[in-house]
Amino acid sequence: MDWQKNLLLAAIAAVILMLFIRWNHFQEQLPQHQAGNTPAGSSIAAIAPDSNGDIPSAVPTASDTPQATADSSKVELIQVKTDNLLVTINPLGGDIASVSLPRHFAKLNTPDEPFVLLDNRNNHTYVSQSGLIGTNGTDTAQGRPLFNSSSTSYELKEGSDGLVVDLTLQQGAVNITKRFSFKRGDYLIGVEYLIDNQAETPWSAQLYGQIKRDSQNFVKVSALEMNPYLGAAITTSEENYKKIHFEDIAKQTFETSRQGGWVAMVQHYFISAWIPDASSQVNYKLRKLGDQDLYLLGFTTQPVVVEPGSKGVIKASFYAGPKDTERLEEISPYLDLTVDYGWLWWIAKPLFAFLKFIHGFLGNWGLAIIGLTLSVKLLFFPLSAASYRSMAKMRKLQPKLLELKERYGEDRQKFSQEMMKLYKTEQVNPFGGCLPLLIQMPVFIALYWVLMESVELRHAPFFGWIEDLSRMDPYFVLPIIYGATMWIMQKLNPQPTDPMQARIMNMLPFVFTFMFLWFPAGLVLYWVTNNLLSIAQQYVITRQIERADSKA
């Protein structure tokens, strides 16, 4: 039995160590440059054409569109406010220069300071660009068009479900409107080019959309922490979800073509993504911009032709917001995979769905975790009961095992043979206490990923001192309770016959308590609840067996 227990402990220790490392990897820290919504005329930089070619290449342009020659820093930016988004649009090119999320705080204790997702200040570049290239394209390496707008401030009014922001441009006899569409309660922005061709010749151009970002990670980390993943992701014909790190893009440009799809910039809890029209054939390209620390993740459509006297529409969508699984799944196939639950996603997704279902009734994510733990415990009740019965029988055999240990202590081979005979005589399965616990480990690992990746748990309070279930317990109360419950469970289990193993077992509650100090409070809450339920179940089963033996 000792070697089997060692095997179980080694497996659990390996899982705990792996999760500890991954928790350090995903532990969210606060960005150093967070800021709220940017008013017009603020210090945010207007985006001028880059000399190293941030505009995608296309066929040579024949556009007679007036190109911006004014000082780009003096361009008055356009502010857009909805219930979910605070957006700054630069009329020079019509790019999205910044996005803040008022429903998600930059810090737990600053609800008036929205989380800044896209930004272009403080030596940091993260913007969303779009334009027209090709024969009659308005965007070239020599300049970007300067759009006109009827206002520099737009706000979604009470009682209104949508907001439209139009930027206009005159290209000879062609009227071009760049339209941004916003919906109440949504983070998806519609981007359309409305072409009214009053010229005598066909008009042709290609739509491009791209995310331009540096590789800087403004996450604070301690000696015990690692940075969360920050990088590109894309769906291809070969892979539904493919991560591409900055260093990989720096080594080699990534290109692919497909119908529809998406390309995204992924970070912990949030993403930005370009989603072309699902019916369009699209070329995707991820590249580094010259020798600069700037990366471009974008797409280019096939040429769109608008005949003389006709009108045309070229459209795409841009998402900037939280990793909301249900919403991302609605927007585009496989975009929800940016909520990365790891290789056990097939367990994690229904777990989260059930957790969300319970939260709908209880209204508190901590109580929902307790409810989920109870449900999982009931699901595995037969396995747990079999495990605890096996442990109770093993505990009864402890005096006989100690007697064998004293008799054959120097002859380990003989001791093992006699021990197996004893198990057979008493009809005890030495694996009975281990395998049921190992079978439950995938559920624990999947739940770990759910708690790590679900933005719903970011800044979600429990009770009292726990104000954020996605972060560590600030006063270490739950880890200490966990250690105490683990110690009690050990006392209910059969003790190792080897003194060294017994000392190691006695140290494990302290070791795991120390490791759990940096785990998210929600995960430790799950383990504390699970341990308390296990103690109660094991105590009842052990007493039932002892009473049955006393009657016999």
From Swiss-Prot:
A single MF term (Gene Ontology): membrane insertase activity
TM spans (from-to): 6-26, 365-387, 431-451, 472-492, 508-528
> InterPro entries in the record, alphabetically?
Membr_insert_YidC (IPR019998), Membr_insert_YidC_N (IPR028053), YidC/ALB3/OXA1/COX18 (IPR001708), YidC/Oxa/ALB_C (IPR028055), YidC_ALB_C (IPR047196), YidC_periplasmic_sf (IPR038221)
Q: Which domain of life is it from?
A: Bacteria
**Biological processes annotated in GO:** protein insertion into membrane; protein transport
The alphabetical list of record keywords is:
Cell inner membrane, Cell membrane, Chaperone, Membrane, Protein transport, Transmembrane, Transmembrane helix, Transport
Which Pfam families has this protein been placed in? 60KD_IMP, YidC_periplas
- UniProt cross-references to Gene3D superfamilies, sorted A to Z: 2.70.98.90
Residue ranges of the region described as Disordered: 32-70
What GO CC annotations are associated with the protein? plasma membrane
Question: Has the keyword Lipid metabolism been applied to this entry?
Answer: no
Location within or outside the cell: Cell inner membrane
The protein's topology relative to the membrane is:
Multi-pass membrane protein
Bias regions of kind Polar residues — which residues? Answer: 32-41, 60-70
Keyword Nucleus tagged? no
Q: Which HAMAP family match?
A: YidC_type1
What this chain does, per the entry, is described as: Required for the insertion and/or proper folding and/or complex formation of integral membrane proteins into the membrane. Involved in integration of membrane proteins that insert both dependently and independently of the Sec translocase complex, as well as at least some lipoproteins. Aids folding of multispanning membrane proteins.
Tell me which family the UniProt entry assigns to this protein.
Answer: Belongs to the OXA1/ALB3/YidC family. Type 1 subfamily.
The entry describes its oligomerization and partners as: Interacts with the Sec translocase complex via SecD. Specifically interacts with transmembrane segments of nascent integral membrane proteins during membrane integration.
Q: What is this protein called?
A: Membrane protein insertase YidC
Q: Which organism is it from?
A: Cellvibrio japonicus (strain Ueda107)
